[in-house]
């Protein structure tokens, strides 16, 4: 039934659905996992890297996380070539605003500007929607630290913690369970991000080269965006594994004590 309505992006099906937009969202479901967590003292992005070739030059290559301006960064899930076009557009919008008003663009305004472009691609014929979902982290003087998510339809929302990409439903339920509102520090958010990625990524053992993590904090009145080095990620993974092993031991001891009773 749907085949008559999915050839053009602008045609509604009898149920009121735009199939091309839904197919674009489907593309994101197969992309590497990306998650964002908002903490009291900062905000972070963590992403799964799929392209981990030994000959890849790390200096020039960031697969999932991009800096947009001095106060914002984003992470992408979906078709990487589409993502490059959108991140370039985000940078241009931010620079134009800075040139015009002599101050950094508010986070939500930048997200809205890009979502207007994404939405236009669902309404005009002859073009397909962008097959990309983005997570944006940023800081501005109006609302402090912020985390946003947008999808191919041009829809966006502010989040405390969220996930896009492969196994995102499982990751979101874990975040819902473990996110402690008002108590999250960046340190505990990093530990939670590693825990979630460990559970949701389709690998038997989490390794540092498969993970990209960026943090956004404020230091002496300036926003600092840092992409964690591989050694730092290794330490986080090692710490998580030690805690898992400790919890497992305690669980076994408890079971043993109950048996002995």
UniProtKB/Swiss-Prot annotation:
Spell out the subcellular localization from the entry.
Cytoplasm; Nucleus
Modification type N6-acetyllysine: residues: 127, 176
A cellular component annotation (GO) from this entry: proteasome core complex, alpha-subunit complex
Positions carrying Phosphoserine: 13, 75, 173
Briefly, what is this protein's role? Component of the 20S core proteasome complex involved in the proteolytic degradation of most intracellular proteins. This complex plays numerous essential roles within the cell by associating with different regulatory particles. Associated with two 19S regulatory particles, forms the 26S proteasome and thus participates in the ATP-dependent degradation of ubiquitinated proteins.
What domain of life does the native source organism fall in? Eukaryota
**Entry coiled-coil feature ranges:** none
Expression by tissue, per the entry, reads: Detected in liver (at protein level).
Q: Which UniProt keywords apply?
A: Acetylation, Cytoplasm, Nucleus, Phosphoprotein, Proteasome
Q: Where is this region: Disordered?
A: 240-261
Q: How does it assemble?
A: The 26S proteasome consists of a 20S proteasome core and two 19S regulatory subunits. The 20S proteasome core is a barrel-shaped complex made of 28 subunits that are arranged in four stacked rings. The two outer rings are each formed by seven alpha subunits, and the two inner rings are formed by seven beta subunits. The proteolytic activity is exerted by three beta-subunits PSMB5, PSMB6 and PSMB7.
Q: Tell me the organism.
A: Mus musculus
Spell out the SMART domains in the cross-references: Proteasome_A_N
Instruction: Name the family the entry cites.
Output: Belongs to the peptidase T1A family.
- State the Gene Ontology BP annotations: ubiquitin-dependent protein catabolic process
Q: Which gene encodes it?
A: Psma4
InterPro entries, alphabetized? Ntn_hydrolases_N, Proteasome_alpha, Proteasome_alpha-type, Proteasome_asu_N, Proteasome_bsu_CS, Proteasome_sua/b
Q: NCBIfam families from the entry?
A: PRK03996.1
Q: What is this protein called?
A: Proteasome subunit alpha type-4
């Amino acid at each position: 039934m749907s085949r008559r309505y999915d050839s053009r992006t602008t045609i509604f099906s009898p149920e009121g659905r735009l199939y091309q937009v839904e197919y674009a969202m489907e593309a994101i479901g197969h992309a590497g996992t990306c998650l964002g967590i908002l903490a009291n003292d900062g905000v972070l992005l963590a992403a799964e890297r799929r392209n981990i070739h030994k000959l890849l030059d790390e200096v020039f290559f960031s697969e999932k996380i991009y800096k947009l301006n001095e106060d914002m960064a984003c992470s992408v899930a979906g078709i990487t070539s589409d993502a490059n076009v959108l991140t370039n557009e985000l940078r241009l919008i931010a620079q134009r605003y800075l040139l015009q008003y002599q101050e950094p663009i508010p986070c939500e305004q930048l997200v809205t500007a890009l979502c207007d472009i994404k939405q236009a691609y669902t309404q005009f014929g002859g073009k397909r929607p962008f097959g990309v979902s983005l997570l944006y982290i940023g800081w501005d003087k109006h609302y402090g630290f912020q985390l946003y998510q947008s999808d191919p339809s041009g829809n966006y929302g502010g989040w405390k913690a969220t996930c896009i990409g492969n196994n995102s439903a499982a990751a979101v339920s874990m975040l819902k369970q473990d996110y402690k509102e008002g108590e999250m520090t960046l340190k505990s958010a990093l530990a939670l991000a590693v825990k979630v990625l460990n559970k949701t990524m389709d690998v038997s053992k989490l390794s540092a080269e498969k993970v990209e993590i960026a943090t956004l904090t404020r230091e002496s009145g300036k926003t600092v965006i840092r992409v964690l080095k591989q050694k730092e990620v290794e330490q986080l993974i090692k710490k998580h594994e030690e805690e898992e092993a400790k919890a497992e031991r305690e669980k076994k001891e408890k079971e043993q004590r109950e048996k002995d009773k």
